[in-house]
């Protein structure tokens, strides 16, 4: 009989077992006597797996161990792949420490502890930044201009400042001059109207016809009319003045008629029929050196009536003025006495100088027809031609030097619009320089005046 040492599979106790000669390893499993199937155990001899049909040897140690149910396999390759990745990466947060906690959680806890410890420092720094921001807002802003374009514009503006001031002064001075001239003209008209109402009876002298026109009458009469307003005279003063004016032998017959009329002391006016348009001709005063007689100019109308006007003369010493009646050749020769209420004052056009006395060359007086007062704009537009040569002016600036009033007269003489500033008037007049009337832009012409409703 042989003796072998057997280790229990469940308890792990080692005990001595006597077996019959010729017994095999399988017999040890039968001696176990458990309900577990024999297929779930195997026998090991001295640490080596023994075949179940192997004979038992005396004195050897046999262990009965249960079988472990393993997987289906294939995990080796997976482990080898993970091992390679673990060697390559530096992120160990997915690993665990010896206590079984993941390194990710451990590191997060450490970071939270440090952040909480520095919370007070962060609050203090935030408050410091807030105070600094408030101080910056309370402080006065400092402007730094480093734009080269800005500096260039400032430099150019300072250079053009003097030129702009000079142009502004020129424009303002021209406006002031025009305003003063308008005020002076209005004062003259007011003074003329006041004198006309309070003066003596006005008379219109006729009967001087056939007198020769003076060659230099236009310029002197214009200057006389511009210098002082005129009013009608009567009585002996008028008689003496007419005698002095008509003292030459050429007008002896006319002066006789005038003397008779003035000595009678009546202001005689003869009403005549005038079928043609009124045309005013200027009779200028006597020159200072020769004292020669200035004769009126004759101009025939379309129906054969002749209108003669004698210029108004304004002697400063006697303040005597004459009016401008119209005379027709075919009128009756009977003089008619006119009262002061029937005499109408005729306004003088200072710019044109065309209100004249009309005389017939006969000894007797024809009945006059009172002239209707004309506005300054109508007289200047109908009678005064353009007095400047536009071709002589090369730039608009040269035309601006003429002033607002002169430019207005030139534009009215051409029938153009006369409104606007000094620069606009000069530019408008310069645009028609050297052009015929049919070549001028129609938009530049002034619109015809509308007839006033009666």
From Swiss-Prot:
Propeptide stretch(es), residue numbers: 1-71
Residue ranges with Polar residues bias: 271-303, 318-357, 376-386
Ranges in a coiled coil: 109-143
Residues at the site labelled Cleavage: 71-72
Post-translational modification as stated in the protein's UniProt record: Upon binding to PCNA, the N-terminal UBL (ubiquitin-like) propeptide is cleaved at Gly-71 by an unidentified deubiquitinating enzyme; the resulting mature SDE2 is degraded by the DCX(DTL) complex in a cell cycle- and DNA damage dependent manner.
Motif (PIP-box): 33-46
Residues in SAP domain copies: 399-433
InterPro entries from the UniProt entry: RNA_Proc_DNA_Dmg_Regulator, SDE2-like_dom, SDE2/SF3A3_SAP, Sde2_Ubi
GO MF term list: DNA binding; snoRNA binding
Biased composition (Low complexity): 248-266
Gene Ontology cellular-component annotations: cytoplasm; nucleus
Stretches for region Disordered: 170-193, 212-386
Compositional bias annotation for Basic and acidic residues: 237-247
Intracellular or extracellular location(s): Nucleus; Cytoplasm
Keyword set includes Cytoplasm: yes
GO biological process per UniProt: cell division; DNA replication; endonucleolytic cleavage of tricistronic rRNA transcript (SSU-rRNA, 5.8S rRNA, LSU-rRNA); mRNA cis splicing, via spliceosome
Pfam families, alphabetized: SDE2 (PF22782), SDE2_2C (PF13297), Sde2_N_Ubi_vert (PF22781)
Family recorded in the similarity comment: Belongs to the SDE2 family.
Main function: Inhibits translesion DNA synthesis by preventing monoubiquitination of PCNA, this is necessary to counteract damage due to ultraviolet light-induced replication stress. SDE2 is cleaved following PCNA binding, and its complete degradation is necessary to allow S-phase progression following DNA damage. Plays a role in pre-mRNA splicing by facilitating excision of relatively short introns featuring weak 3'-splice sites (ss) and high GC content. May recruit CACTIN to the spliceosome.
Protein name: Splicing regulator SDE2
């Amino acid at each position: 009989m042989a003796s072998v040492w057997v280790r229990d599979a469940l308890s792990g106790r080692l005990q001595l077992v006597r077996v019959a000669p010729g017994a095999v390893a399988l017999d040890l499993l039968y001696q176990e006597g458990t309900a577990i199937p024999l297929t779930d155990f195997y026998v090991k001899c001295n640490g080596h797996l023994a075949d179940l049909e192997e004979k038992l040897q005396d004195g050897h140690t046999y262990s009965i161990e249960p079988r472990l149910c393993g997987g289906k396999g294939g995990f080796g390759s997976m482990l080898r792949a993970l091992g390679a990745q673990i060697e390559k990466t530096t992120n160990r947060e997915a690993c665990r420490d010896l206590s079984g906690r993941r390194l990710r959680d451990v590191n997060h806890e450490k970071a939270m502890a440090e952040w909480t410890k520095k919370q007070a420092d962060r609050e203090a720094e935030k408050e410091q930044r807030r105070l600094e921001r408030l101080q910056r807002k309370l402080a006065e802003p400092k402007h730094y201009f480093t734009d080269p374009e800005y500096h260039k514009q400032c430099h150019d503006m300072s250079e053009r400042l003097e030129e702009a001031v000079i142009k502004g002064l020129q424009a303002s001075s021209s406006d002031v001059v025009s305003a003063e001239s308008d005020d002076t003209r209005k004062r003259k008209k007011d003074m003329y109207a006041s004198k006309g109402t309070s003066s003596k009876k006005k008379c219109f002298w006729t009967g001087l016809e056939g007198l020769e026109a003076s060659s230099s009458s236009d310029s002197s009469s214009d200057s006389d009319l511009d210098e002082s307003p005129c009013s009608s005279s009567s009585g002996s003063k008028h008689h003496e003045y007419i005698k002095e004016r008509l003292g030459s032998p050429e007008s002896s017959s006319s002066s006789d008629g005038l003397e008779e009329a003035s000595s009678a002391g009546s202001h005689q006016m003869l009403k005549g029929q005038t079928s043609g348009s009124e045309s005013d001709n200027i009779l200028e005063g006597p020159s200072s050196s020769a004292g020669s007689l200035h004769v009126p100019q004759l101009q025939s109308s379309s129906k054969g009536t002749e209108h003669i006007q004698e210029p108004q003369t304004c002697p400063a010493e006697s303040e005597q003025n004459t009016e401008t009646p119209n005379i027709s050749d075919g009128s009756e020769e009977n003089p008619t006495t006119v009262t002061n209420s029937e005499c109408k004052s005729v306004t003088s056009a200072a710019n044109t100088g065309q209100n004249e006395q009309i005389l017939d060359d006969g000894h007797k007086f024809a009945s006059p027809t009172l002239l209707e007062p004309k506005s300054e704009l109508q007289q200047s537009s109908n009678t005064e031609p353009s007095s400047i040569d536009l071709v002589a002016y090369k730039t608009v600036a040269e035309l601006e030097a003429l002033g607002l009033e002169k430019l207005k007269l030139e534009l009215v003489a051409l029938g153009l619009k006369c409104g606007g500033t000094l620069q606009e008037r000069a530019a408008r007049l310069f645009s028609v320089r050297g052009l015929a009337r049919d070549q001028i832009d129609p938009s530049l012409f002034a619109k015809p005046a509308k007839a006033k409703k009666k």
